[in-house]
Amino acid sequence: MFSSVNTCWTLVGAFLVYFMQAGFALCEAGFTRAKNTGNILMKNMMDFCIGTPCYWLIGFGLMFGGTGALIGGFDSFIQGDYSHLGLDIPLWVYIVFQTVFCATAATIVSGSMAERTNFKAYCVYSAAISLVVYPICGHWMWGGGWLQSMGFHDFAGSAAVHNVGGVIALLGAWMLGPRIGKYDKDGNPHAIPGHNLTAGALGVFILWFCWFGFNGGSSLSLSTDATMTLTGLVCFNTNLAAAVATCVTMIFTWLRYGKPDVSMTLNGSLAGLVAITAGCDTVSPFGAFFIGFVAGILVVLSVEFFDKIAKVDDPVGAVSVHFANGVWGTIAVGLFSTGSNTAHAGLFYGGGLAQLGTQLLGLVCVDVYVVVVMFIIFKIIDKTLGLRVPAEVEIDGLDIHEHGLASAYAGFAISDANSAAMTPNENTDLGEDDVTKASAKQMDAAVPVVREPVIHDGVYDTGMHKVSIIAKLAKFDQLKTALNDLGVTGMTVTQVMGCGIQKGTPEKYRGVPVDTTLLPKIKVEVIVSRISVDAVVEAAKKALYTGHIGDGKIFVYNVTRVVKIRTGEENYAALQDVE
């Protein structure tokens, strides 16, 4: 007899865990560059869609098809008898719940190998993870395998999901090598910030929300007082550990870097969630507090270690979040377990080293298995399909070469975070933001004018000039209106990247100084003959002025010759009847 309450609760948990795919997609896309956004989204979609039939094919059978020490059984398409699981929910409900967990393990790998992985290779190794890697590890810990028989405890997947995915992420990033430009010739890291911190933050919020289904749903039951109490404790511990880890990461980066690091703090939230996942059912809130506290520091130190010492390029911090804190969360069970739901209490609760030893043994064996199998798979893929894309593909971006996608943001001007528009600050403020009150000196400082000397000898003087205006994107409409009011009827407009003497806004990304920042600008070019050049210059200066250095720059050139291609007309005549 099935329990409708437990069935509904398990399905809700499964749906929430599925929605974690959206969180991972946004998080990874935001923490990488815009030219690879489509590729990131495609990978997060396909690892789930590839993993689902693979897990149905043999994965679930290997994981739960029997109680053997090493594997469950070979049950293609899940047709066997699973009564030994003792479920009070329909088998297919349980299969759905386990399928979305399997997909999560594969998704973790995407982030660390982002921006340089061959898409074909990604599809192949995602299938391998869902077919043989995750199911066998899962059987050892959850399916009646040898680790579960020894008393190894991993309630919702710090080891089975996050550590497994994190180990593969570490191995893959190491075998791929760093992105072009990540390290200089001396091995010093260069920061490569993501292009959309807003998307990254939204992804973290989605993941945090879905984690209540990831951990809470793992109880598989809400039908008794005991299971309702357990689920409540699981959800509370999950939230507490994540919140504490976030606060600790913020404070730690504030002390370490001089300012609280946003991207690192977001990763701190995920680190706390990963770390509490193994023991959320067996630790007290005090234990959850300390687990989150350590996770908040560990994620920062881990990012710095892999970035600066190990030289493993992990664009989104997946290794530090999932591997480092998956290991920590699994070990923490052996330290903080109160003895409920585990074979032994943790070291700090009088249980001695028994539970801790089992947790450590399980981690070592699982990681060795994963590394050996995935190293072989990666090597085979590298020798056949190629694991990494060519340099020119990486430089141009995977979107255009791998998917024929010019931009994931059609219709929008999107630049990477290291190309973000510079905001006014005290170093550029000229003391007057009203153009009508600004002095000539302030106007010239905000929008300097560079005039090319007019050459008479040997140069035909047409009486025409080209005025080239470099301005902020936000000021284009005002500039266009000012030029139209003046009578300028033709202009050429292009988007450009560059920086002036300010060299962009100085910043750090995950503790690494960001190189010279290129800022998105608009370049407007007009050719004038009858209209006074000085009138054009003054109109542009008034339209662009905000009272800060960097408002824009104007270049004035002498035009020696203009030719209209269609008619052959030259100079002033060539400018008439503009097509």
Give the predicted meaning of each segment:
Residues 1-456:
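Glycine- and aromatic-enriched membrane alpha-helices
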Residues 401-405, 420-579:
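Positively charged, small/polar-rich N-terminal and surface patches that mediate targeting and assembly
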